[in-house]
């Protein structure tokens, strides 16, 4: 078990660094990778708690960039619908959720690599729709950051503004779904001991990501990240049929 958690912590740190740099959030990489070493619903529970600390770190590091209007218009529907998505995990079979997660993540990554997401228009309607979809999928499959990222990209925010605005929205989403996951038994008493490690990882990963962001072209790194996501989700999807 300790060996599993050691790998889990390494994956969490890697995903946190990558998530900060790419602006997609760490869950799109972390959830499918962590599901290889731990039960999927346990990953959902731990990820939600981990992300609370992760987003607090990002909000502190990038706090000057928060766009309050976008955060409210995208964040309110996300917070409302994440609860609905999280409750669905009690009724949909786990294997089907995992398969659906990997299919959706693979499709989003492929869509973003194609460049078509740049055609999304800057509008309140897209903010409300993006918030609804990102929140629902964050609750159901553990990640909605890519959809939120696609929506935010239409507004041409600066790096700091993009990350800070995304983080404060994600904060509300994670607090909401964490409550549902804990009530559903996904995060149990035995996992409380992980919290100090998750706090350290979230701070270290966010800080490292911010420093690296100054040296690596964001666009180049995003394509690398998307490639890793494609490969990871494809491998996980194939494992479903083994």
Regions found by a protein language model. Give the residues of each.
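Residues within membrane-spanning alpha-helices of integral membrane proteins
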Residues: 5, 48, 102-105, 109, ...
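Interfacial loop-to-transmembrane junctions
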Residues: 207-229
């Amino acid at each position: 078990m300790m060996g599993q958690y050691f790998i889990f912590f390494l994956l969490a740190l890697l995903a946190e660094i990558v998530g900060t740099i790419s602006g997609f959030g760490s869950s799109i990489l972390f959830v499918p990778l962590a599901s290889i070493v731990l039960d999927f619903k346990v990953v959902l529970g731990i990820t939600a708690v981990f992300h609370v600390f992760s987003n607090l770190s990002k909000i502190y590091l990038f706090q000057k960039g928060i766009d309050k209007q976008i955060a409210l218009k995208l964040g309110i529907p996300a917070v409302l619908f994440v609860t609905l998505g999280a409750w669905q995990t009690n009724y949909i079979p786990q294997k089907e959720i995992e398969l659906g997660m990997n299919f959706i993540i693979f499709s989003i990554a492929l869509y973003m690599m194609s460049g078509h997401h740049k055609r999304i228009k800057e509008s309140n309607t897209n903010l409300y729709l993006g918030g609804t979809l990102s929140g629902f999928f964050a609750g159901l499959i553990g990640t909605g950051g890519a959809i939120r990222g696609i929506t935010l990209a239409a507004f041409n925010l600066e790096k700091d503004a993009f990350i800070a605005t995304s983080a404060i929205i994600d904060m509300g989403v994670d607090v909401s779904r964490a409550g549902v996951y804990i009530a559903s038994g996904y995060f149990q008493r035995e996992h409380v001991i992980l919290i100090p490690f998750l706090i350290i990882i979230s701070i270290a990963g966010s800080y490292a990501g911010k420093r690296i962001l100054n040296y690596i072209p964001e666009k180049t790194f995003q394509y690398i990240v998307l490639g890793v996501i494609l490969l990871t989700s494809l491998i996980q999807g194939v494992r479903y049929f083994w």
